């Protein structure tokens, strides 16, 4: 029996108060400024509108560029054709190196609004006034796949946020999982080399179901915690909108007078958490590789701007090792029982990019982009990222001036002595670009904690010790937290993790690597190891109970809470062009869309009122499937055979929707469609009856999102 042994520890955690007991308004400067903010206003000066204009060269002359200059109608193209050379040359250089990780992504602009004046916990300007707004840009991504890989590959997902604050850019470069695979950044190349495609044949793409990945995971036990999260629904979210975000590392927040606390950053989705199931994600990768980026784009374009709340966990500096692990260890998360989440503000993504390359591809996030009031810790993974992210941008952009790209420019302006370099965009008036200098009158002046609201390192931070190449012994426990995570899932979610590990490990060809996997799993849970061993045809290991416990924590399960909103979820209405069914489908669509759902009517061909044909439709595109009255005719007999769609496609859509845990329904006589695929009307998440009754049921079912009763759990088939 499980018991919750994680109890709140009163008195240990500082509380964020929306009031500042010591703030001097005259010292706060820009902090007090507020007002409405346009998410893309800063980019308008570099927008180019071709409407009503003639074609020009890159240097501004009007041209015709559809035909190259030749010697006669059938002659050679002339070398002097600068128009041809410029057009082809520019095309040849349109791409920059893709990110070595997080190459596949999508982004959006938005606004962050502070819920209060949080100057009692941080000097950060963007958190210094109630209702203060700050423009943001967020880039969501997968980690391992190339830029052309599928959105729904099982992976950790990037959640990188830039705040364009009035005191410089601040980036939270996080993921949708609160922990990471390694503890020391020096092992990052090893991690990525292991999960990337094999260097001999470039296979597999965006997948870890291969020998090298699991060789690394089973040889590097620090990876197990993140691995368990990735094997759960967190690795295959329903959309970017339906996942949380985490800063991963422990940072510091510092007040104006130098008082500091340790902090963990959290983004909490206001859409609710939701995930796909594995087969659904696999099929979706083939049916619509752009599913997540299309979902984000469509939601924003339709006025359904997604939002998240920014929350923090605050910890006293002297409590870094008070909870049984080290807060400097990025493979550990801080259970909410020890430090409750304190919500600071809300972010809404309300503008899509105007140009993917100029904005989403060229934005250059860095953990080193911090502002006054925020500081680093000695987390060894964070320390390495501070170097690596800057270095990779130098590689991608072939020089140091990538911060001058419009998407990277701070709204606060840039004044320093950095000069020249490839792609220099500024014309600097200061010819005495060095400091100190009498000739430039001391400008740009030095800013610090007391003058000019400059960045300052936390007062009192010290570092000393014997030089060595090792990790602290406080980082050594690699098994307690993965077990805590697994214990905290519902039984079906646990089964999903087991099934995912079975799937991945079954692709491993080396027998010793498979045995190593079982050995590591056994240190987390003998039950997990035994259940995986059965699928691999291997002998189960004996229990290794050193780290076994029955503790649970809250906030890690995806499926045990109903969605707070069903707006923008997608419903497929199966119909037919025969017998008046389309009229019934249109009525269904009208009613469902009143509640913010996105409804697609499907039939044999694109008649009036049909949004998609059966030949183009698939259950992966919908969160619920409803059969309109009269459409039962396409589920059996001659109606199921048509040259307009693959044989049995209507039944396949309904069956897959049911198998993948979605709400399924039938109106009136269409309940015969449910019967034809062997689905009982009384099952959870199955609705049949009159239109109003079905609509009510489907909308309630969408809040549940996935009906876990439909998924088998190990032992269910035992008598």
Swiss-Prot record:
Its EC number is 1.11.1.6. Heme binds at residue 389. It holds the Pfam family Catalase. It catalyses: 2 H2O2 = O2 + 2 H2O. InterPro entries: Catalase, Catalase_AS, Catalase_clade2, Catalase_clade2_helical, Catalase_core, Catalase_immune_responsive, Catalase_large_C, Catalase_sf. Its cofactor is heme. PANTHER family: CATALASE, CATALASE B. Occurs in almost all aerobically respiring organisms and serves to protect cells from the toxic effects of hydrogen peroxide. This is Catalase-3. It comes from Neurospora crassa (strain ATCC 24698 / 74-OR23-1A / CBS 708.71 / DSM 1257 / FGSC 987).
